[in-house]
Amino acid sequence: MRDTDFVARLHRNIVLLGSQLKTRFKDHVVLSTSLALFAALLLVIPFYGCSPAASENAQGSSTAQTEAQKDQKETAPEGTVKATSFYSPTLGLDWNYDVYLPADYESNPDKTYPVVYMLHGLYGNHRNLLERFDSSAMLDEAIQTAGQGAIVVFVDGFNSFYIDSADRGLKMESAIMNDLVPYIESTYRVSKDRRDHAIGGISMGGYGAARFVLHHSDYFSKGILLSPSVWTTLADDNFIYTSQHAFSDGTTSWSWDLYKQLFPTQYLGEVDPSQVSFFVATTSDDGVVPVADVDAFVEQLKNAGINVDYQRDSGDNHNWKYWSRVAPTAYAWALDQFKSADSK
């Protein structure tokens, strides 16, 4: 209904009702006129706004909502996370780990999958990357997008820095390579192709993952390093000197010399640079591992001819908020790398 039609209808109703009311209220002209106007408005106002244009707008809005619903992505198929353990001869204990199996794992009994080992940070455990942020949901989405599945193992590394401690500490590096990796391969359908083997981690775990790729490149080909603890220097009052013992040399809790001897880049000479690659992410606002230290580490990798996808941004800090922001991209990178390797 157009505005001119509305006015005409309003006028007709006022005149009609005015005449009727004047007949009944002859001595109250003002009252009758007011009542007529009020009644007319009550009659026609409900119809105002139900014009073809308004109706079309409502219909268009409904259509847009329907189309938007159609465009929404289907919920990604959910993988399965199993919490379990096995006995590690190297560590001399029942060793906890979690494993993520892609949604199609059980329905494809003859299929093998790439594997990613994920390492937690200092003071953490194997549950961190599943509880502090939802790695399972992230992997579901990444797998759906990439069209590439993977088995992901969440390792309990204690506070070991994932090395073989020189002074009565854990032999974590040996435990992973000699106990965990063979056990995972015998228990789950892991691809034997080294191009399908990746390892990643946050903070201390990023340091460990870098060492495994460079020191064990015969098995690992890809590394995911999120805020890796690759310090070039530490302030004299840094808490690490007194609170950690992984790099103890028997005389001090933290031996800077031992840390340097085991630093990941010490193994660059063992690596064919064309056979390994890294995803590295950090923020310039990191207050634990200075971005300059990560820059220097990445530069060493690149100078050695290694392919590095380096994502440096700002905001957040050395914390779960930052890692939850970059982890989906890291997982997607690994899956894309696996898919690319399979196509060659």
Spans of model-derived segments:
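Sec-dependent N-terminal signal peptides
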Residues: 16, 27-41
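Intrinsically disordered, low-complexity segments enriched in glycine/proline and serine/threonine
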Residues: 23-25, 29, 59-62
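N-terminal secretory signal peptides that target proteins for export/translocation
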Residues: 1-27
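Enrichment for repetitive, rod-forming helical segments
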Residues: 16-19, 33, 127, 192
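C-terminal motif of bacterial Sec signal peptides marking the signal peptidase cleavage site
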Residues: 48-49
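Low-complexity, intrinsically disordered segments with a bias for serine/threonine
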Residues: 23, 36-38, 65
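Non-catalytic cap/lid and distal C-terminal segments of serine-dependent acyl enzymes
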Residues: 52-344
